[in-house]
C-alpha cells in the first residue's frame, strides 16, 4: 500500500475552557491523557506501522527516500506526536510518558489549536510539570518562575492565562527545577523542559483550557477537599516517576532567593 494513500485523523484536543473548579479540571485533564494513551495511541501505532511498511517497500533510494526509511524504522516502534514527515529528528514518545503543560495567552492558545502546531518559527517551547488546576499557586509566582526558567522570553500575567496539555516528546530537554511558594507558605517543586523551535511542525495537543492560578495573592483559595491543601500534585506526574535517560541532572533553584537577589 502506497504511503500517500493512508490517512489518519489526528487527535482532537479536549476543550476544558468551561471547567468550573480545580477538581473538575483535574479529572478532565487526566481523562484526556488516558484517552490518548490507552485508546488513540493504538490506532496511531497501527497507522504508523502501515505507513512505515509502505515506505520500506519502496525500491527508490534517493536521499529523501533514505531519510523516510530511517524515519519508518522509528515509527514502527514509537508513537510520534506529529504526522510522518521528512524530518531528521521527529517528536517521538519517551520511554516513560511525561505529562507537561505549556502556558500561553488565550490568543496564542487559539492559534495553537487552529494551526495544530506548538512551535512557530524558531521560537522555543517552554513546558512545565506544574498543573493548571493548582489554585494554591499565585499567578504572579508562576510568572516569576517562567521568567527565571527561560529569561530569553519575558512573560506577563496575560501570557499564562491559557494552557495546553501535551506529552513531552524526546525533543523536550530537562531544563531545571524551581521551588515556588504557594499561598499556604509551602514550597512546591516545579520542573521545566524546553524544546527548541523547528518551524511550524504539527503536534498532538491533548487538552486546552484556562488556568486556575490565584490572581490575588491576598485571597486564600478554598480547598476543594477537606485538607489544608488539596494534594493533587501526584495524580498526573509523581516524584516516584523514574528519571529518563538523557535527562540532565536537575538544578534546584529556590525562587525566593532568585527573586530577592534581583
Curated annotation (Swiss-Prot):
Keywords: Hydrolase, Plasmid, Protein phosphatase. InterPro entries: Glycosidase. It comes from Rhizobium rhizogenes. Residues 221-262 are annotated as: Disordered. Its EC number is 3.1.3.48. It is an enzyme of class 3 (hydrolase). The lineage of its organism: Bacteria, Pseudomonadati, Pseudomonadota, Alphaproteobacteria, Hyphomicrobiales. Pfam families: RolB_RolC (PF02027). This is Protein-tyrosine phosphatase RolB. The keyword Hydrolase applies. GO terms for molecular function: protein tyrosine phosphatase activity.
Amino acid at each position: 500500500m502506497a504511503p500517500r494513500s493512508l490517512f489518519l485523523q489526528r487527535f482532537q484536543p479536549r476543550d476544558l475552557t468551561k471547567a468550573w473548579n480545580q477538581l473538575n479540571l483535574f479529572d478532565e485533564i487526566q481523562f484526556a491523557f488516558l484517552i490518548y494513551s490507552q485508546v488513540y495511541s493504538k490506532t496511531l501505532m497501527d497507522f504508523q506501522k502501515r505507513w512505515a511498511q509502505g515506505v520500506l517497500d519502496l525500491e527508490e533510494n534517493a536521499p529523501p527516500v533514505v531519510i523516510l526509511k530511517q524515519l519508518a524504522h522509528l515509527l514502527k516502534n514509537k508513537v510520534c506526536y506529529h504526522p510522518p514527515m521528512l524530518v531528521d529528528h521527529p517528536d517521538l514518545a519517551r520511554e516513560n510518558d511525561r505529562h507537561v503543560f505549556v502556558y500561553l495567552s488565550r490568543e496564542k492558545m487559539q492559534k495553537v489549536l487552529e494551526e495544530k502546531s506548538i512551535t512557530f518559527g524558531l521560537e522555543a517551547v517552554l513546558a512545565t510539570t506544574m498543573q493548571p488546576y493548582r489554585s494554591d499557586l499565585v499567578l504572579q509566582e508562576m510568572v516569576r518562575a517562567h521568567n527565571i526558567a527561560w529569561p530569553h522570553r519575558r512573560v506577563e500575567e496575560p501570557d499564562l492565562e491559557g494552557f495546553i496539555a501535551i506529552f513531552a516528546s524526546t525533543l523536550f530537554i530537562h531544563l531545571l527545577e524551581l521551588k515556588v511558594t504557594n499561598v499556604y507558605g509551602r514550597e512546591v517543586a516545579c520542573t521545566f523542559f524546553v524544546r527548541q523551535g523547528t518551524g511550524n511542525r504539527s503536534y498532538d495537543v491533548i487538552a486546552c483550557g484556562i488556568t486556575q492560578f490565584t490572581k490575588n495573592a491576598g485571597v486564600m483559595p478554598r480547598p476543594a477537599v477537606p485538607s489544608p491543601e488539596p494534594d493533587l500534585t501526584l495524580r498526573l506526574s509523581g516524584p516516584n516517576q523514574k528519571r529518563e535517560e538523557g535527562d540532565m541532572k536537575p538544578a534546584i533553584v529556590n525562587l525566593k532567593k532568585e527573586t530577592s537577589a534581583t
